[in-house]
């Protein structure tokens, strides 16, 4: 669930209500990055069993859900390339020897011209069909890596 607050005081009230309802876990607070859905990107990557990134597919989110429980879920995505942005995430994944699929939600912050990652999902994202539509068969990377032991030449 995503909650938004206009001030620190409002955030404190929301947090108190959440815990008062019986929620026992930690809560993550994030800066609200201004901008509409077109500022969002989604990046899906596959890192092989040696921690090397074999595939990256960057999607430009055109439309997100705006229902209370659907907020933040992507509805319409087209692929694009932004090699400097993709390389930053590739470098990160390889620096931590990550293995498997990863999925990042990223938003452009026009306040300072930076890209902000909201999270990393250690799996394919809910909206990962854009990857297959772009020509990257998500099952093939696992088969090539673990069963066929194919060498990799890179796919972005």
Regions found by a protein language model. Name each.
Residues 25-26, 99-100, 152-153:
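Short, structured loop/turn "capping" segments at alpha-beta junctions
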Residues 30-31, 99-111:
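A short glycine-rich, hydrophobically flanked beta-strand micro-motif that places a catalytic Asp/Glu
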């Amino acid at each position: 669930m995503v909650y938004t607050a206009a001030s620190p005081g409002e955030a404190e009230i929301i947090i108190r209500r959440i815990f008062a309802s019986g929620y026992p876990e930690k809560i993550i607070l994030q800066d609200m990055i201004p901008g509409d859905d077109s500022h969002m990107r989604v990046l899906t990557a596959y890192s092989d069993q040696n921690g090397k990134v074999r595939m990256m597919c960057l999607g430009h989110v055109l439309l997100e859900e705006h229902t209370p429980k659907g907020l933040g879920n992507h509805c319409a995505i087209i692929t694009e390339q932004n090699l400097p942005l993709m390389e930053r995430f590739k470098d990160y994944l390889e620096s931590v020897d990550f293995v498997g699929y990863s999925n990042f939600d990223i938003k452009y912050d026009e306040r300072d011209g930076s890209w902000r990652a909201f999270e990393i999902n250690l799996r394919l994202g809910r909206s990962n069909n854009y990857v297959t539509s772009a020509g990257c068969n998500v099952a093939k990377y696992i088969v090539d890596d673990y069963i066929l032991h194919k060498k990799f030449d890179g796919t972005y």
